[in-house]
Structures are given as structure tokens and as C-alpha cells.
Curated annotation (Swiss-Prot):
Gene Ontology biological process terms, A to Z: flagellated sperm motility; proton transmembrane transport; regulation of intracellular pH; single fertilization; sodium ion transport
CC annotations in GO: plasma membrane; sperm principal piece
Cellular location(s): Cell projection, Cilium, Flagellum membrane
Region (Disordered): 1-41
Coiled-coil spans in chain: none
Segments traversing the membrane: 67-87, 95-115, 116-136, 152-172, 187-207, 215-235, 260-280, 284-304, 337-357, 368-388, 398-418, 431-451, 472-492
Gene Ontology terms for molecular function: antiporter activity
Organism: Macaca fascicularis
Name the UniProt record assigns to this protein: Sodium/hydrogen exchanger 9B1
InterPro entries reported for this sequence: Cation/H_exchanger_TM (IPR006153), CPA1_transporter (IPR051843), Na+/solute_symporter_sf (IPR038770)
Residue ranges, compositional bias (Basic and acidic residues): 1-10
Protein encoded by which gene: SLC9B1
Family classification: Belongs to the monovalent cation:proton antiporter 1 (CPA1) transporter (TC 2.A.36) family.
Function: Sperm-specific Na(+)/H(+) exchanger involved in intracellular pH regulation of spermatozoa. Involved in sperm motility and fertility.
Compositional bias (Polar residues): 16-31
Length: 511
């Protein structure tokens, strides 16, 4: 009896403790709550006083481990190429030059990403890649040992152009194109054509270019750079700036169409410039090359739609490899047989038609092509920077080039503002769109050197004009890429309205 009574009393004590403890925690007026509150506040006050110990782990981990690993991988790759190819991998060889330019461009891009200026958005990495190649070319000791033959650089730049065209073709959404309002079409077509025409007129009278070369330069400058516009618009879109008016979506959708138009015009002018016949014969040859590229692109585009079939393993990888090899072969092959510009239009048509049937698998193929672009991007901008030599530039020539470029940009900005006047945007929004439609980078980095390489192979007597086109393209990237990124990052939050409620976001591309 005594034991049972003690057990009952013990159980009652436990029940009493468990019943009172939650009540004291729930009741904010209870003394227990105040005690626990003071204990928590004391611990919170003590926490900042604790010092974290910094130490280096053994073996190394993190960023330092990754840097050492990548360095060893690059060294092993160089050792392998040297053991197979010998002098090509030594200083002065092509592979050695490509490896130095590739690594320097990556380092230049990373350094530019690390530079942070208060209240200023980060600069695009491609600018660091461009400056890295420019530094390699213009430092005497380095330039003696880093050399890439023109044939090698031409093939790499043409391959980079192919990757850009594939991305542009796959990026064209047929549903969006079908339902696009007039404002998007105006933004994609109007500024590009007007800037190309303005640059042609200014270069003809200021730079003394023939008219065919003037329009060739105009279409080189007429393209906007999605590599600058799209990341900046995505940042603004994530923060809610201009989303209800559809400004980020408008600029991202129109950028691909703008590039397609500029590249098509460039290919047509390139065929005319480097053909040996008269004006009528050149026009007929251009129509033939366009017809051939369209027909071949449509036929092979439908082929790639269904081959490989959807039941194949690694479907996205096979599709990406097939479309990449087809398009690279077309671009390089058309240059080999003298049909300049045919491969570019073929690539656009093939990738667009093939992508319309791939539905969900299209995103996977785009990811594969993006990974390929990540490899060719530092090579492209590094090689473009390495083509520009300060010793060959004259101060008055640079002034003429900058004047031509600046006047063409002013025309583009003015035309963009005028075309947006009847689209339902406010004054500040029209100013932002006009300034955001200015940056140039990827297309100019490909088309400028392509003119130079074509002249070296087909018409050496036209090389002075091609060097001028190359220099203007370099200056266009150097001036507009960082300034455009900075203007979008700084003026976006100031000129665009911010919307916090995602349910109220509507895409309004009014006519």
C-alpha cells in the first residue's frame, strides 16, 4: 500500500510539472516565460562575442583546392599535346598560343567579376576576356611567344559564330513570334536597319568607304548583344522592375530577332563585297545562295526533328551533337567553296525548324549548346582582342572611327525612342529602352574578324578595309558593352516602376 501511494504521488508530481511547463511557456505574463526570455536574450548577446577560428585544412579544400586542381589539369593537357604534337605546344606554336589566350581570357573575366564598385552593377566578364587578348597582343615579350595562325583563329571564330547562330535559332519561340505585338517587331527591326543605314552613310563620307563596304560595316554594328541585355533584364525582372509593363520580356524577345536580321544582312553584303561579278551578277548570286541555304536548312531541319527518335537513349545529347556538327560543317564548308554567308542562314533556319518540334527536350539541347558556348566564349573574345595592335593604330584614325560609331549610336537611340512613343510606355521607360538597346559584344566579336579572314583568303587587296571594320567592331565592344551594362543596372531601378505582387504582373506588349 505504501509503495502504491508513493507511485501515485510521484505520477501526480510529474503530471503537475508537465502541465504547468507548457502553460508557463505559452503565457507571456508568466515568470517562467520571463526567465526563459532573459536567458535567450543573454545567449543572443553573448553569441556575437564568440570568435570563429580560421584555419587551413589539410588536405586543402574549397576554392584553393579547385584552383590547384584546374592548374594541374591544364598542365597535364599541355604535356599530352606536347608529347603528341611537339613544337605546336611549345612557345610560338598554335596550341601554346591558344592555351595562353584561353587561360588569360578566363582569368580576365574572373577578375572583372571580382571588381565591385559600390552602387554600380558588375561589369560583363566578356570585357575582361577582350582586354586579356588585347594585353597579350600589345605586350612585346608576351606577343613574341604567343602566336596563333590565321587559319586556326578563323576556324575557331567561325565555330563560335555557328554556336551563336544555333542559340539564336533555338531561342526563337514560334508561339511568341506568332503572338508578338507590333511593338516587339518594331524594336527588333527598326533600330537595326536604321543604325546600319546611318553607319553606312557616315562611314562612306567620314571613313571614305565604298558603299558596299559601308553597308557591310553597318550590319556589323547593327546587332545588339543578348550577352549584355539578357542578364541585365533578368536581374531587373527578378527584382520586379518594369515587369508589369513587360519591358524585360520585350527586350529579351526582340534581341534574338535583332541579331537574326543583322546577321542575315551581313551575310548578304559579304557575298556582294567578295564576289567578282557586276552588280546584277552579285544580286543573282546572293539570291541563289539565300535560296540554297533556306532550302537546305528547311530539309535538314525537318530531318533533325525526327532523327534521332524520341525512344533513343541520351536523346538531347545526340540532338545537340547532330545539330552542332551539321551547322559547323555548313558554315566552314560554305567558306571553303566560296559561298560566304550561306552557312549562317542555313544554321538559323535548321535550328529554328528543328526546335519547334522538340518541345520539352529543347531546353536540354539549349543547355548543351550553352555549355559549348562557355568554352568558345573566352577563345572568341581573347582572339578578337589579340587582333588589335596599338602600334598599327593612328590617333586621327581612332577619332574618325569613334565619331562614326558615336553618330550611328545616336541615330539608333533616337529611332528606338521614336518607335516606342506609340507603345504605351512612359517617358522614363522609353528613355530606358532606348539606352538599353545600345550594347554590342558577341555578334561584333564574330563578324568583325570574319571580314578580315575572308579578305586575307579571297581578296588580299581589300585587307585595309577589313582591318578598319575589325577595329570599329573592337571599339564598339569596348565602348558600348560596359557602358550599356552600367546604364541598365543604374537607370533600371530609377526609371522603371517596381511591382511587388507577382499576381498582378501582366505582359503588356501593346501596339
Amino acid at each position: 500500500m505504501h509503495t502504491t501511494e508513493s507511485k501515485d504521488e510521484h505520477l501526480e508530481d510529474e503530471n503537475f510539472q508537465t502541465s504547468t511547463t507548457p502553460q508557463s511557456l505559452i503565457d507571456p505574463n508568466s515568470t517562467a516565460h520571463e526567465e526563459t526570455k532573459t536567458v535567450i536574450s543573454d545567449t543572443e548577446e553573448i553569441k556575437p562575442q564568440t570568435k570563429k577560428k580560421t584555419y587551413i585544412s589539410c588536405p586543402l579544400r574549397g576554392a584553393l583546392n579547385r584552383i590547384i586542381t584546374n592548374g594541374v589539369i591544364l598542365f597535364v593537357i599541355w604535356c599530352t599535346t606536347w608529347s603528341v604534337l611537339g613544337s605546336e605546344a611549345l612557345p610560338g606554336g598554335n596550341l601554346f598560343g591558344l592555351l595562353i589566350i584561353f587561360c588569360s581570357a578566363i582569368i580576365g573575366g574572373k577578375i572583372l567579376q571580382l571588381i565591385r564598385i559600390p552602387l554600380v552593377p558588375p561589369l560583363p566578364p566578356l570585357l575582361g576576356m577582350l582586354l586579356a587578348g588585347f594585353t597579350i597582343r600589345n605586350v612585346p615579350f608576351i606577343s613574341k611567344h604567343v602566336h596563333v595562325h590565321n587559319t586556326w583563329s578563323s576556324i575557331l571564330r567561325s565555330t563560335a559564330l555557328t554556336v551563336i547562330l544555333i542559340r539564336a535559332g533555338l531561342g526563337l519561340d514560334p508561339q511568341a513570334l506568332r503572338h508578338l505585338k507590333v511593338v516587339c517587331f518594331r524594336l527588333a527591326v527598326g533600330p537595326c536597319l536604321m543604325e546600319a543605314s546611318a553607319a553606312a552613310v557616315f562611314s562612306h563620307f567620314i571613313m571614305k568607304f565604298p558603299w558596299e563596304w559601308a553597308f557591310l560595316l553597318g550590319f556589323v554594328l547593327g546587332a545588339v548583344s543578348p550577352a549584355i541585355v539578357v542578364p541585365s533584364m533578368m536581374v531587373l525582372q527578378e527584382n520586379g522592375y518594369g515587369v508589369e509593363e513587360g519591358i524585360p520580356s520585350l527586350l529579351m524577345a526582340a534581341s534574338s530577332m535583332d541579331d537574326v536580321l543583322a546577321i542575315t544582312g551581313f551575310n548578304t553584303c559579304l557575298s556582294i563585297v567578295f564576289s567578282s561579278g557586276g552588280i546584277v551578277n552579285n544580286a543573282i548570286a546572293s539570291i541563289k545562295s539565300v535560296s540554297i541555304s533556306l532550302l537546305a536548312g528547311i530539309v535538314l531541319g525537318f530531318f533533325v526533328r525526327y532523327f534521332p527518335s524520341e525512344d533513343q537513349k541520351k536523346l538531347a545529347l545526340e540532338r545537340g551533337f547532330l545539330i552542332l556538327t551539321m551547322c559547323v560543317s555548313a558554315v566552314l564548308g560554305s567558306q571553303r567553296i566560296g559561298l560566304h554567308g550561306t552557312g549562317g542562314l542555313f544554321t538559323l533556319v535548321l535550328s529554328f525548324i528543328a526546335g519547334t518540334k522538340w518541345s520539352q527536350e529543347k531546353m536540354k539541347v539549349q543547355k548543351i549548346i550553352t555549355n559549348v558556348w562557355d568554352i568558345f566564349q573566352p577563345l572568341l573574345f581573347g582572339l578578337v582582342g589579340a587582333e588589335v595592335s596599338v602600334s598599327l593604330l593612328e590617333s586621327n584614325t581612332i577619332g574618325i572611327f569613334v565619331a562614326t560609331l558615336s553618330l550611328a549610336l545616336c541615330v539608333r537611340i533616337l529611332v528606338t525612342y521614336i518607335l516606342m512613343c506609340f507603345a504605351g510606355f512612359s517617358f522614363k521607360e522609353k528613355i530606358f529602352i532606348a539606352l538599353a538597346w545600345m550594347p554590342k559584344a558577341t555578334v561584333q566579336a564574330v563578324l568583325g574578324p570574319l571580314v578580315l579572314e575572308t579578305a586575307r583568303v579571297s581578296a588580299p587587296h581589300l585587307e585595309p578595309y577589313s582591318k578598319d571594320v575589325m577595329t570599329v567592331a573592337f571599339l564598339a565592344i569596348l565602348i558600348t558593352a560596359p557602358n550599356g551594362a552600367l546604364l541598365m543596372g543604374i537607370l533600371g531601378p530609377k526609371l522603371l516602376r517596381r511591382h511587388y505582387d507577382p499576381s498582378k504582373i501582366k505582359l503588356q506588349l501593346s501596339t
